[in-house]
């Protein structure tokens, strides 16, 4: 038996699955045949679990059928694990011409791309070590860490999308810093979209546009923040499109971020949006309670403060935000209040320090407001939230509203059930679990949920 069997299995799966599913879950797998065992290696635990639950049975059937065509009645064992094929050597680092020393000079439009000094623009303090991990962002973290280990090999391009303030920029810097830590000679550049556009305009004025394109195409990794800024800028999109193609063809890593899913970015050429979808698109969700607590404690420690657990939970339960910078602002206010008064950090001090912030937040997250916003979003009547109607067009929005009420308010399950037509707390619990399941399996539901949280947090 040989790896040709696995390649044929992949070819069949590629024909049966959507391009996105195949590229996301199966293409990254590495394989190794040893006697009667096919070992499959996934880049991270999340991918491994997804493949095991969704595709493993199909893979086993196809591999066995292919083996039987060559050797009837011969059985094959398939193992799935996290890691790399032991015999696969690490890709050698790209050789950087000696004429290209790393400097802190910005783009100047020199005549030859390989002689253009570059500035990474990376902020060294942003690393994986100080990025607080939780359920809302663990897939994004695992994926970017895998990319840092093998840039250009898997998940290329990577598209991260999230509401502002949820860590997209931090992760871009973290993966760039990790790549440079592994190979200091790598040419890695982080750049905001508006700076890219401005540099391109300057190169046109200076008649150095070809050198500009060559320079970006010569990088080992390009990290572009806020890609939605390119909307409506046709010439910039054309240059980005050419750069994109050149880098992907050369297996050079591209990571992009935006505040919305690629297909939702208006004013972007369809060719570019298609390219964005070639790799993996990952959302970063608003942090859940436990992650908010961890963020608060971490940010307090960075300021030399000891934030008691009960105080951290008190703040986290009342600031169910979609922007981590709000939590950072809360810690700054608490720190200033504690220093000014000389008091210890207690719930009483926090209530005083965050009085205005907590008042605004409480106003935004009432059950009535949630019902109103969800009803408007799904174009149903507010009265449907408490009615006995069970049609999907009504029941699904009602379940989503219940889940939002549990996440965004301090009401108990019985209180939430009462607000939704006197329903039992078990009905609310079922709704929350159902919505959580749907968000994992249905991109439309996931996007709706994120939009609703964003709206309710404004």
Curated annotation (Swiss-Prot):
Specify where the region named Domain III, AAA+ region lies, as residue ranges.
Answer: 121-338
Start and end residues of each stretch annotated as Disordered:
92-114
Recorded GO cellular component terms are: cytoplasm; plasma membrane
For this chain, one GO molecular function annotation is:
DNA replication origin binding
Q: Name one Pfam family in it.
A: Bac_DnaA
User: For the region Domain I, interacts with DnaA modulators, what residue ranges are annotated?
Assistant: 1-79
Q: Which InterPro entries match?
A: AAA+_ATPase, Chromosome_initiator_DnaA, Chromosome_initiator_DnaA-like, Chromosome_initiator_DnaA_CS, DnaA_C, DnaA_dom, DnaA_N_dom, DnaA_N_sf
Q: How does it assemble?
A: Oligomerizes as a right-handed, spiral filament on DNA at oriC.
The record's section on HAMAP family has: DnaA_bact
Q: What is this protein called?
A: Chromosomal replication initiator protein DnaA
The organism encoding this protein is: Psychromonas ingrahamii (strain DSM 17664 / CCUG 51855 / 37)
